[in-house]
């Protein structure tokens, strides 16, 4: 999701460092810096020099077509934006919809027998699925990206809950139920999740 619910003014400092780093190494194109955040400090992990799976949420709150910009850069054209042109508006959340058991992540190949995606203002679905599509046994589990936006995190979560309830995929197992469960957990709603949140939540669920 974007913007992060875990940081405040530190994000602005970090972003300036990312821009400075790109200028220093002469990087020109789309890229993503990844950090871990703990106790008021952020720690650099890596830079991915490509368009990320999560790019739709950035597009939704900036209004910038990141894929289009990357294609333009690859063609030798200049970027259409400067750093001061980038303004965040609202909040966006992305749920990766995978063809797998929602709680043990066992792959679920098969034929899509029935399929309906949510829509409307504030909802975006990126997918290649259609009714009758066969998911082979050798595959990437990602079958769709469901995004929801709102003027703040609370409304984005509410929008996502509705969108997930309207997402229908029959013929295979998928992780929509997992997303529905997670978006109702108080820790998630309060923004208190961590990199260990999912594994801890699943462990607690199995004990019940």
Language model features with spans:
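Single conserved hydrophobic/aromatic residue that forms the stacking wall/gate
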Residues: 1-13
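Solvent-exposed alpha-helix faces
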Residues: 11, 19, 161-165
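Glycine-rich phosphate-binding loop of ATP-grasp-fold ATP-dependent ligases
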Residues: 9, 32, 55-58
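Anionic group-transfer/hydrolysis microenvironments
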Residues: 12, 36, 48, 96-98
């Amino acid at each position: 999701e974007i913007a992060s619910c875990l940081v405040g003014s530190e994000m602005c400092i970090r972003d300036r460092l990312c821009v400075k780093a790109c200028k220093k190494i002469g990087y020109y194109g789309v890229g993503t810096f990844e950090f871990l955040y703990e106790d008021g400090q952020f720690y650099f992990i890596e830079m991915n020099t490509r368009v990320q799976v999560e790019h739709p949420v950035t597009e939704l709150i900036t209004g910038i077509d990141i894929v289009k910009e990357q294609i333009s850069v690859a063609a030798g054209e200049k970027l259409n934006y400067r750093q001061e042109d980038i303004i965040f508006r609202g909040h966006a959340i992305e749920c990766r919809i995978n063809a797998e058991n929602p709680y043990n992540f066992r792959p679920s190949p098969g034929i899509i027998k029935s399929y309906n995606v949510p829509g409307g203002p504030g909802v975006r679905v990126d997918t290649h699925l259609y009714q009758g599509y066969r998911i082979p046994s050798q595959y990437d589990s990602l079958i769709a990206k469901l995004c929801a936006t709102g003027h703040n995190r609370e409304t984005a979560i509410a929008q996502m809950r509705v969108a997930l309830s309207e997402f229908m995929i029959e013929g295979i197992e998928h992780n929509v139920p997992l997303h529905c469960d997670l978006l109702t957990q108080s820790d998630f709603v309060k923004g208190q999740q961590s990199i260990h949140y999912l594994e801890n939540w699943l462990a607690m669920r199995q004990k019940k």
